[in-house]
């Protein structure tokens, strides 16, 4: 497989060798995914349920949490999870969240700009894809082949690529030449009001050398081009973030995209570019 197809396989299957072993030579990524997950008798027809039964004694509670977290990319607080799932807010929920985190289904993080409270975020690509598309469309034997580049799957492609980036933090830091700089990783979401639109940043690398990498992650089948509308959105997020920083801190606008950036009149604010190849370092 090409590196582009390997990234796509991570977006759907999380790069798990067990799943990738079913890929058949001579077939495209889309065709292989259809054969494994869609149609009347796909190889992984009951994989979502089988996976949780095999790992957890309280599989149903775990699936409730995963279904909840799949609804919002930046995640939920423990209290929000309890409310959405009906699970008691107590030690049992804490133990289940810990077990899911230790098994790499979810991650726990502290959102930038919030002094208290932790969020839980779904990071398992297979679960995200299953809940988004497989459950509702499994009988459609050519679903991925017919829809992968269409608007039907556009939103998911962006979110899934972001998940892959979160799973390759060390490679991203290495590409930025900051592997030895102490840093924390966070997401940031700020609500707007009547005078100003809100902003959502899917990855911040907050460094001890007083630089913050504001990371924009874009999945693309070709070198990425920034138009005037996208530039405006990026500048808005940049300005909103700067308002929260100290006078000592600087922001480096960082683009992470599969095939790099086409430099043009709207790309001037981008200071660092990380490519798909960098994720293999």
Could you tell me what each predicted segment is?
Residues 1-51:
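Amphipathic alpha-helical "lid/sensor" segments that cap RecA-like P-loop NTPase cores
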Residues 4-7, 17, 31, 63, ...:
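Non-catalytic, well-ordered alpha-helical scaffold segments
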Residues 10, 80-83:
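The alpha-helix within a helix-turn-helix
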Residues 29-80, 152:
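Winged-helix-like regulatory helical subdomains adjacent to P-loop NTPase cores
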């Amino acid at each position: 497989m090409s590196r582009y197809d390997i990234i796509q396989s991570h977006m759907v299957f999380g790069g798990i060798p067990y799943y990738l072993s079913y890929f058949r030579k001579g077939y495209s990524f889309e065709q292989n995914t259809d054969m494994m997950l869609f149609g009347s008798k796909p190889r992984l027809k009951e994989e979502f349920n089988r996976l949780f039964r095999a790992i957890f004694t309280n599989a149903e509670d775990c699936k409730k949490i995963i279904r909840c977290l799949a609804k919002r990319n930046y995640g939920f607080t423990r209290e929000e999870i309890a409310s959405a799932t009906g699970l008691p807010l107590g030690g049992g929920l804490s133990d289940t969240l810990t077990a899911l985190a230790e098994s790499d289904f979810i991650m726990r993080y502290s959102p930038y700009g919030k002094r208290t409270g932790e969020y839980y975020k779904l990071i398992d690509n297979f679960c995200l894809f299953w809940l988004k598309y497989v459950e509702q469309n499994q009988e459609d034997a050519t679903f991925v082949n017919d829809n992968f580049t269409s608007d039907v799957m556009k939103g998911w492609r962006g979110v899934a690529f972001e998940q892959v980036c979160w799973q390759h933090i060390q490679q991203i830091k290495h590409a930025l030449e900051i592997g030895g700089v102490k840093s924390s990783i966070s997401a940031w979401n700020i609500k707007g009001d009547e005078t100003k639109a809100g902003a959502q940043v899917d990855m911040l690398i907050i460094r001890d050398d007083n630089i913050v990498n504001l990371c924009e992650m874009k999945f693309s089948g070709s070198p990425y081009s920034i138009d005037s509308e996208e530039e405006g959105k990026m500048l808005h997020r940049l300005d909103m973030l700067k308002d929260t920083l100290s006078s000592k801190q600087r922001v480096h606008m960082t683009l992470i995209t599969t095939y790099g950036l086409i430099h043009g009149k709207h790309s001037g604010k981008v200071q660092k570019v990380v490519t798909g190849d960098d994720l293999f370092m």
